[in-house]
């Protein structure tokens, strides 16, 4: 902590909720944000983090932020499309060249693309502070290995709320089961779904 920071009375306390585990890749981004915000304001601003969906999943947290009931929340682009349909462009398969991903995030966080998105998000009472990469998502199953596209036929796959994700699952002859990330572990244990659409970093956590 900066000198005197631990003794300074916070003038503003901002609650930041998300559905990730504390050690998820994007969660570490939020921890760093908290550290810098408190440091740069000399302790006048305190960021209180709520992880593991204790205040709700992406949709609930974003709706709460939109209404002003919550100061900040983390939301994946797959759920952001519920509030601003154009955000679904990020869910299209192969739309982002991996070799240009760094340039994309630079434009999102520091350039014209981020400014453009915020101009439109403002119309639905939202504003993006930062875009974090949580790695590409993959199909994973708990009942049988995925050896080829034929292996996916008939699999009941947990997907996000994104219409793009669900249409892709149907195109691959799976049965999509859209649900929030916070529900995934339980439904896999219960056998309600056969697999999940998830990033490798989230599988690890």
Feature-to-residue mapping (PLM):
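Short beta-strand-to-loop elements that line the ligand-binding cleft
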Residues: 47-56, 158-159, 174-187
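Pocket-lining segment of extracytoplasmic ligand-binding domains
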Residues: 79, 164-166, 174-205
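Immediate post-signal peptide segment of exported/extracytoplasmic ligand-binding proteins
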Residues: 2-18, 38-46, 122, 144-156, ...
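Extracytoplasmic small-molecule ligand-binding "clamshell" domains
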Residues: 32, 46-65, 98
């Amino acid at each position: 902590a900066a000198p005197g920071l631990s003794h300074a009375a916070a003038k503003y306390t901002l609650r930041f909720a998300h559905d990730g585990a504390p050690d998820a890749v994007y969660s570490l981004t939020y921890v760093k944000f908290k550290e810098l915000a408190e440091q740069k304001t000399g302790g006048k601003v305190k960021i209180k983090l709520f992880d593991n969906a204790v205040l709700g999943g992406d949709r609930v947290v974003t709706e709460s932020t939109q209404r002003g009931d919550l100061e900040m929340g983390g939301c994946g682009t797959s759920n952001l499309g519920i509030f601003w349909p154009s955000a679904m462009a990020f869910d299209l398969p192969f739309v982002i060249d991996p070799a240009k991903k760094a340039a994309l995030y630079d434009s999102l966080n520091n350039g014209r693309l981020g400014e453009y998105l915020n101009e439109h998000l403002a119309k639905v009472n939202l504003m993006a502070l930062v875009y974090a990469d949580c790695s590409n998502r993959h199909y994973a199953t708990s009942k049988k290995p995925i050896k080829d596209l034929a292996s996916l036929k008939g699999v009941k796959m947990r997907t996000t709320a994104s219409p793009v994700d669900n249409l892709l699952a149907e195109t691959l002859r799976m049965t999509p089961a859209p649900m929030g990330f916070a529900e995934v572990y339980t439904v896999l244990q219960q056998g309600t779904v056969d697999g999940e659409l998830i990033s490798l970093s989230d599988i690890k956590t």
